[in-house]
Curated annotation (Swiss-Prot):
Physiological role: NDH shuttles electrons from NAD(P)H:plastoquinone, via FMN and iron-sulfur (Fe-S) centers, to quinones in the photosynthetic chain and possibly in a chloroplast respiratory chain. The immediate electron acceptor for the enzyme in this species is believed to be plastoquinone. Couples the redox reaction to proton translocation, and thus conserves the redox energy in a proton gradient.
The protein's name in its UniProt record: NAD(P)H-quinone oxidoreductase subunit K, chloroplastic
InterPro entries reported for this sequence: NADH_UbQ_OxRdtase-like_20kDa (IPR006137), NADH_UQ_OxRdtase_20Kd_su (IPR006138)
The species this protein was found in: Buxus microphylla (Littleleaf boxwood)
Domain of life: Eukaryota
Example of a GO cellular component annotation carried by this entry: chloroplast thylakoid membrane
The gene coding this protein: ndhK
Length: 200
């Protein structure tokens, strides 16, 4: 046998030998065991709960919900993320082992939703805190859309090269800042300004 060339496979062992790369083998094993950490804060998470039932059966994708971030490799964020909860979400993400993935589920998670215009305590998009792999719009998204997002994430995982992902994560790290709110003195006295009532 020539050590420089690949060994020839005869007809008897041809059906029992699989040739692959270590990267493809790693991607295949991760496809079969995406373990999500569920981070739900409002109504989108209730819609996600229907996936656990027999109708949608998300166990067929190898999804086993975990309660510890150290055992999870996927975090599903659903619902409004407030400034008070933002450090907890970042801490959960940082405790997850590499490679880790994020699915942002629902309008409130992606853009802040209806709370983004007049609420000072809402994070206007979870991608300002952690890197997001798949965006899932809707208010709330249907379970079929969640299955589609998981399928798209599985396609992304199957095509990625591990070394490229590590370099990408080192270049595009998300850093958070401490938000400081300045409380001003109230100008409200409890009385109506009669001049404002009769202006035309």
């Amino acid at each position: 046998m020539n050590s420089i060339e690949f060994p020839l496979v005869d007809r008897t062992t041809q059906n029992s030998v699989i040739s692959t790369t270590s990267n493809d083998l790693s991607n295949w094993s991760r496809l079969s065991s995406l373990w999500p950490l569920l981070y739900g804060t409002s109504c989108c998470f209730i819609e996600f709960a229907s996936l656990i039932g027999s109708r949608f059966d998300f166990d067929r994708y190898g999804l086993v919900p975990r309660s510890s971030p150290r055992q999870a490799d996927l975090i599903l964020t659903a619902g409004t993320v407030t400034m008070k909860m933002a450090p907890s979400l970042v801490r959960l993400y940082e405790q997850m082992p590499e490679p880790k993935y994020v699915i942002a589920m629902g309008a409130c998670t992606i853009t802040g939703g209806m709370f983004s215009t007049d609420s000072y305590s809402t994070v206007r998009g979870v991608d300002k805190l952690i890197p997001v792999d798949v965006y899932l719009p809707g208010c709330p998204p249907k379970p079929e859309a969640v299955i589609d997002a998981i399928t798209k994430l599985r396609k992304k995982v199957s095509r990625e090269i591990y070394e490229d992902r590590i370099l990408y994560q080192q270049e595009n790290r998300c850093f958070t800042t401490n938000h400081k709110f300045h409380v001003g003195h109230s100008t409200l006295t409890g009385n109506y300004d009669q001049g404002l009532l009769y202006q035309s």
